[in-house]
Amino acid sequence: MDAAVTDDFQQILPIEQLRSTHASNDYVERPPAPCKQALSSPSLIVQTHKSDWSLATMPTSLPRSLSQCHQLQPLPQHLSQSSIASSMSHSTTASDQRLLASITPSPSGQSIIRTQPGAGVHPKADGALKGEAEQSAGHPSEHLFICEECGRCKCVPCTAARPLPSCWLCNQRCLCSAESLLDYGTCLCCVKGLFYHCSTDDEDNCADEPCSCGPSSCFVRWAAMSLISLFLPCLCCYLPTRGCLHLCQQGYDSLRRPGCRCKRHTNTVCRKISSGSAPFPKAQEKSV
């Protein structure tokens, strides 16, 4: 009986022989070492000779050992996958470092910065830049044509009128200027809006200049404004305030304009000045 049981047990194939037809990968599907030793070592066979095996107990114990082998098998597979992932990450990191080392220039040819850079200089305001430009307006090396009567430059940027200062507010949506303050303060903006919606001609400028004396429906505009002034009395303050604004504009222009302001140039001659040269002596006057 013992010899028959031993022959039947030897006919049972081990698990590695059952899976030999499948292409195995040493890095992923490596068989567990404890299970291989348990199936291939002769000590297990010797112990089976010593123990009394029966035909009823052998089929129940064998699947139990096979299930233990299957339970132990995923652990090395998981470890092998984690080791592969770690090796791939190390190789990727090393390649990235080599790439950065090849791109980054060597510090041997560059100076080493040892001090913390200070805060950047804030850009100057437009008014300060304009003031510097106007202060340098009297320098003869920066202007080409000088008037002989007043000694000032006659180029177009210098002789242009200087408007009153203005700025943009609300993320550059609202223009804050003397003109806009005058329109909103005297309710002229309401008149402009009314004329804009009542006008049928797209080329009509009555909405832009409602107080002009132009031939474009002048009588109708002034009559409508006279009627609206009964409900908006602040419209009566528009003309006096407009005159005050014009005087302020003239005063600001006389103070800030660096160019020539001569009205007539009948006996004046403009001359060209080279940079770095001394002031020329007074030239002879000749008629133009």
From Swiss-Prot:
Localization: Cytoplasm
Domain SPR: 154-260
Inducing stimuli: By FGF signaling. Repressed by microRNA-143-3P, which results in activation of MAPK signaling and promotion of excess accumulation of extracellular matrix. May thereby play a role in myocardial fibrosis.
BP GO terms, sorted: animal organ development; negative regulation of ERK1 and ERK2 cascade; negative regulation of fibroblast growth factor receptor signaling pathway; negative regulation of MAPK cascade; negative regulation of neuron projection arborization; negative regulation of Ras protein signal transduction; nervous system development
A GO CC term assigned to this protein in UniProt: membrane
Primary subcellular site in the record, as a coarse category: cytoplasm
Keywords from the UniProt entry: Cytoplasm, Neurogenesis
Protein origin, superkingdom: Eukaryota
Pfam families: Sprouty
InterPro entries in the record: Sprouty, Sprouty_domain
Tissues expressed in: Widely expressed; particularly in the fetal tissues. Expressed in the brain with expression the highest in Purkinje cells in the cerebellum (at protein level). Expressed in the myocardium of the heart.
Keyword set includes Metal-binding: no
Note: The gene coding for this protein is located in the pseudoautosomal region 2 (PAR2) of X and Y chromosomes.
Function description: Inhibits neurite branching, arbor length and neurite complexity. Inhibits EGF-mediated p42/44 ERK signaling. Negatively regulates the MAPK cascade, resulting in a reduction of extracellular matrix protein accumulation. May function as an antagonist of fibroblast growth factor (FGF) pathways and may negatively modulate respiratory organogenesis.
Subunit structure: Interacts with TESK1. Interacts with USP11. Interacts with CAV1 (via C-terminus).
Similarity comment: Belongs to the sprouty family.
Record-given protein name: Protein sprouty homolog 3
Species classification: Eukaryota, Metazoa, Chordata, Craniata, Vertebrata
Protein's gene: SPRY3
